[in-house]
Swiss-Prot record:
Lineage of the organism: Bacteria, Bacillati, Bacillota, Clostridia, Eubacteriales
Naturally occurring in which organism (per UniProt): Desulforamulus reducens (strain ATCC BAA-1160 / DSM 100696 / MI-1)
Protein's UniProt name: Putative competence-damage inducible protein
Domain of life: Bacteria
CDD domains, per database record: cinA (cd00885)
Membrane-spanning ranges: none
Length: 411
């Protein structure tokens, strides 16, 4: 079964808005064994939209259309579908009442133009929108289906999960099913990653692919099978081999948030953490504090950008700074011990490094030291992060959280 996705909205064409729908729908449909054969982005003009829809109907079994379901005159998706299929637009009373209730819950009266959102091509299956005022729809024609979804990502994704998945699962002959496992790595470049697992690549099914973001290399293992169990088995077998070879660089898997994992591990262990940061400027503490309830384990942090702050606030000995420099193993350890002592936490985590764009004290750009202090002792690691300033800082944050995770795991 093949699908085509049409993204509507002039804001997408001119680059004002990032098209996150492409990634989400492409991934979800592929996982369900539906082959996505084409993406098309079209502006808010019904003539072009109609032409694109006609072409898609010739190629694909399923046509997904996102956006253009609002109450304004340039929201033309449903009207275009009706025009192309020569269908009348009909008012859905249940949708109209749901839209009225949406406004009433906010102490507002529904504007008259929102009535437009309750009209659908005749015979359409209405998809309720639990997070907005724009219901979606499924229109079936000649053994094909046009699936109309709202533009805002949070509305579209919720509607897909709540209504579209069950519809797609009811369709026969979806083809092979697909699943994947993703590993997120830091402190290593893409080429080195490939060298370490080169003999595992090129199998075809399952296959390994790579994606590089600032400070992160993603390794994805993807498998296909006649059943989800078969595909999952293929992925699990290869993933275990990948995990063993790359363990020291893996900081997260799939959609896992390492800061959330570390936080829960601290809670389970009854421990607290404090952070001393130089080159990351508070990014580690920000990641940890982004999780609700972080006050249960995060004591606080110190941004020690200068030698003076490292010495006065964290108690880094002046002779350590003079002999080894601000970017050194010795300074990182002293920072970790100092922040644990001064803030009274169970664990002290510290980073110091050269984020660039120029070297410092003769130390190269990308050189970073990370240290962790606990009642049982200290551990540290030296990194040479590739890339620009943003990538180095991002990699440092992930590596520091990985060190905390491995410590809490006892590894």
């Amino acid at each position: 079964m093949q699908a085509e996705i049409i993204f509507t909205g002039t804001e997408l064409l001119v680059g004002e808005v990032l098209n996150s729908h492409a990634q989400y729908l492409g991934r979800r449909l592929t996982e369900m064994g539906i082959e996505v054969i084409q993406h098309t982005t079209v502006g808010d003009y019904w003539g072009r939209m109609g032409l694109v829809l006609l072409q898609a109907l010739e190629r694909a079994d399923l046509i997904f259309i996102t956006g253009g379901l609002g109450p304004t005159i340039d929201d033309l998706t449903k009207e275009t579908v009706a025009e192309v299929l020569e269908l009348d637009m009909k008012l859905d009373e249940a949708s109209l009442e749901a839209i009225r209730e949406h406004f009433a819950k906010r102490g507002m009266e529904m504007p008259d133009n929102n009535t437009k959102q309750a009209y659908f091509p005749e015979g359409a299956r209405v998809l309720p929108n639990t997070r907005g005022t724009a219901p979606g729809a499924i229109v079936e024609v000649d053994k094909k289906a046009i699936i109309i979804l709202p533009g805002p990502p949070w509305e579209m994704e919720t509607m897909f999960d709540n209504s579209v998945v069950s519809y797609l699962n009811s369709l026969p002959h979806r083809g092979t099913l697909c699943t994947s496992k993703t590993f997120r790595l830091t402190g290593i470049g893409e080429s080195t990653v490939q060298e370490l697992i080169d003999d595992l690549c090129g199998m075809g099914n399952p296959e390994i692919s790579f994606l590089v973001n600032p400070g992160v290399v993603e390794v994805r293992v993807t498998g296909q099978g006649a059943t989800l169990e078969q595909a999952t088995g293929l992925v699990q077998n290869l993933s275990e081999q990948v995990r063993k070879r790359l363990f020291q660089y893996i900081f997260a898997e799939d959609d896992e948030k390492i800061e959330q994992v570390v936080g829960q591990m601290l809670i389970d262990a009854g421990l607290t953490i404090a952070v001393a940061e130089s080159c990351t400027g508070g990014l580690i503490e920000a990641r940890l504090s982004d999780i609700p309830g972080a006050s249960r384990y995060l004591v606080g942090g110190v941004v020690a950008y200068t030698k003076q702050v490292k010495e006065r606030i964290l108690g880094v000995p002046a002779d350590t700074l003079a002999q080894f420099g601000a970017v050194s193993r010795q300074t990182a350890i002293a920072m970790a011990e100092g922040v644990r002592r001064e803030l009274g936490s169970s664990i002290g985590l510290a980073v110091t490094g050269v984020a660039g764009p120029t070297s410092s004290e003769g130390k190269p750009v990308g050189l970073v030291y990370i240290a962790l202090s606990s009642p049982t002792g200290v551990c540290y690691r030296e990194y040479r992060f590739p890339g620009e300033r943003k990538a180095i800082r991002s990699g440092t944050v992930n590596a520091a959280l990985k060190m905390a995770k491995h410590f809490l795991q006892g590894k």
